[in-house]
Amino acid sequence: MGVEVEFFAICMPGYTITRRIVQPHELIAERGERFTVDQSIGTEYDSMVFYTVREALFLLKSGLRKFFLKRYLYSRQAKIESVAFLGGWKDRFAGTHFHIAFGPSGIPKKQAEKLAEHIHDHIPFLIALCANSPVWRGKLTKYASNRFLLGSEEYCCVTKRGDLDRYHYDEINYNKRGRKPPTLELRVCDSNIPEYLAAALVMLKAIAQACIKGRRISNVCRHENYLIARENAAREGVKATLFWKDKKLSVPKYLDLLFKYYRKEIEGMDVPDELLDVFKLLKIGINGAEIVRRSCRSLRRSHPRGWERHFGKKYALAIEELLDGHTLRVFARELGVRLPVTDRVKLG
């Protein structure tokens, strides 16, 4: 497993969230990771390969914190204060692309086609899980993923289950480019913090393991219902209505079915408690978009004319705390959002 994460910079003066490229010195890159430039948004981080979700969470934090340039002697860029993992802000989108393979040599096309069938009708759930762009062009909107709603026709083209092509901008595609081994690529998720990316990897790894074992596809829906769920997930996030075998379900009930169906695969992963907390929070109506929304809503009340600057300042501190090893709860608290206790929330 691996990810490509696109993101914004937080620049001075004014803690402005911008497209400015953040470029760490290449000598601090570890083998297998790249600091690169995306044509659309600018800054992109290409991770090394992960084999476990615990490894993914640790290495994502370790890799992404290298973009705190002010901490390095030879990677400083003037006026860059921090970075922001958001799916959208002004007028550009930032996304996360997941790459899945079955070994060092990648994944053959036939196996990728089979795995894509297992994943396809869960795509709306993954959109809801990772929705993280409620702000667009300086306005707090009612939508969870403006990036997906406004950019999917160009950057995440809809596919039908059973159709897997090499077209780069399909929402799920067979990625066989350059010298890298071929992978199955999923492009639907907003740019996000490591906890949400690793949570998505939990579900993708569980589905992949079930596919390898020869288990049946867990969810098959009519294409028209898939399209409805896809749109619902981008608009409403955790409040969306999804479909499981063409039956309407809320996101919490859908999540429970996922944990029931893939219980053996998930139990065998040694999923960290902080990732289980992500799922528990999702079950009670909180994802990345909701955390950002609550923070922005509070700041609009207290600083109606300068709420974006205050959000940028809070986010700069919050993301440093998170990537330095603290939890999602600390991140949310630094943004002024108190997350509810989830000790009694059960999954599955």
Language-model features and meaning:
Residues A78-L126, C130:
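Long, hydrophobic, well-ordered secondary-structure blocks that form the structural core
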Residues M1-I80, L86-W89, E117, A128-G348:
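C-terminal accessory/tail domains of diverse enzymes
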